Design a protein with these regions (language model features):
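Alpha-helical structural motif
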Residues: 4, 8, 73, 176, ...
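Residue-level detector of flexible, active-site-proximal loop/helix-junction positions
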Residues: 65-67, 95-97, 159, 175, ...
Length: 232
């Protein structure tokens, strides 16, 4: 096992234990976008499912938005899941912009993706949905919420949903993006080339630059930010 793999696995295991993400009897549905983070999440949870305790079942779902002009490499995702012993479900969804012209395409797309994912999970006996957000995602979201919303909040490692009998888990919560990127390169993950033409990235990209600047000022900045949210 390579050094980056070891670091990711160690932090993945620590996150699962510290935040009680995996319990005996869990049926977990992974939201597989096709990016490096969700691919690594499939690989790690597939390995974890082969361990006797806790006994968990893991499958994945990839959602295609029928009215958005982009497409991922579906055959690669199917092959990747098969190689890891994970069943992949291909789900279709769409949205009608005219239903609420005040909402952006990105909001409507994300809302409908999640609704499709949640309903499929409930109807097929899953009790948890695993998302591929890592520590960098969580801390950049924190900075965005502080800067633009005046809210000291961010995504949680574990979040029970109010309107569905489901819990959202983020097993990569303690994993650094740089380590996932290194694993993706070493294991030759195929990068998805077709990007959504409507993707809104400017604000998040700006906050990522702020986060990187904070780490240059203080190499321990990420841990200080993390403690400010999760260890108060």
């Amino acid at each position: 096992m390579m050094k980056a793999e070891q670091k990711v696995l160690k932090r993945f295991n620590k996150g699962c234990v510290d935040y009680h993400l995996l319990e005996d009897g869990d049926r977990i549905l992974i939201a597989l976008s096709g990016g490096k983070d969700s691919l690594e999440l499939v690989r790690l949870l597939a390995q974890r499912a082969r361990i006797y305790k806790p006994h968990i079942e893991v499958e994945a779902a990839h959602i295609i938005m029928d009215n958005i002009p982009y497409e991922t490499d579906r055959s690669y995702l199917q092959d990747f899941c098969a190689e890891n012993g994970i069943k992949l479900h291909i789900l279709h969804s769409s949205f009608d912009e005219s239903t609420d012209p005040r909402k952006t395409r990105c909001f409507l797309c994300a809302w409908n993706r999640r609704k499709t994912l949640f309903e499929f999970a409930v109807n097929n006996g899953f009790n948890k949905i695993a998302l591929g957000h890592h520590m960098d995602d969580i801390l950049v979201t924190l900075l965005m919420n502080i800067t633009f919303e005046g809210s000291h909040s961010t995504m949680q490692p574990s979040l029970p949903l109010k309107h569905y009998p489901l819990t959202i888990i983020r097993p990569l919560s303690l994993v650094h993006e740089a380590d996932i990127r290194q694993v993706a390169e070493e294991l030759h993950f195929t990068k998805q080339k077709a990007l959504c033409p409507y993707e809104e990235t400017t604000r998040r990209a700006d906050m990522q630059a702020v986060f990187q600047h904070l780490e240059r000022l203080n190499p321990e900045a990420r841990y200080s930010l993390w403690r400010s949210v999760f260890m108060v």
